[in-house]
């Protein structure tokens, strides 16, 4: 750009774009430079709108930047932190998603499998312990000790401890509903 009265052109600074006397973006006959605003990126004196989903462009950007893990970018002008129970593990996330059933998300950047004796519904921040006299099930309702999504009451004829469901098998014993041992 050439400021009024200058004999030689001045290179446009990194993160800036060139404008004419009316502050309109131009590539020729530029008289000044302006700082690249948030939501745009500027390179070689030109200003471009940041339009790629999952990216953002802070002030003085020279290119779109992927939204960092643990956050998401609905618009290129802002980064939004994911809430607990949401999952934003990868960079470039456009929208958060709830933590998957069978997993928990103590931090938005990680999704951990539920351990034995616990279950995790969709969006769980932490695992929920299986209650006494109950057993854990997968998404199809089948008994499981890993990646459980819910708990069910222990039916008659079974005893349930630590999320496990075991049939009563000793002769002369029975197991009423919610049993934790053979009686």
Segments and roles (model prediction):
Residues 1-183:
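Disulfide-rich, cysteine-dense extracellular ectodomains and adjacent flexible linkers of secreted
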């Amino acid at each position: 750009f050439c400021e009024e009265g200058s004999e030689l052109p001045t290179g446009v600074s990194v993160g800036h774009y060139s404008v004419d006397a009316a502050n309109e973006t131009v590539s020729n006959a530029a008289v000044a430079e302006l700082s690249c605003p948030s939501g745009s990126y500027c390179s070689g004196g030109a200003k471009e709108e940041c339009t790629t989903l999952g990216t953002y462009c802070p002030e003085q950007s020279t290119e779109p930047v992927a939204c960092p893990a643990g956050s998401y970018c609905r618009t290129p002008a802002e980064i939004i932190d994911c809430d607990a129970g949401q999952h934003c593990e990868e960079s470039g996330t456009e929208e958060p998603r709830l933590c998957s059933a069978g997993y928990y998300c103590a931090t938005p950047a990680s999704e951990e499998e539920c351990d034995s004796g616990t279950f995790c519904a969709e969006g769980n921040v932490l695992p929920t312990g299986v209650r006494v006299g109950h057993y854990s099930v997968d998404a199809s309702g089948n008994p499981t000790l890993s990646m459980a999504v819910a708990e069910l009451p222990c039916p008659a004829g079974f005893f349930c401890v630590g999320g496990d469901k075991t049939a009563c098998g000793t002769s002369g014993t029975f197991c009423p509903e919610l049993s934790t041992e053979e009686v």
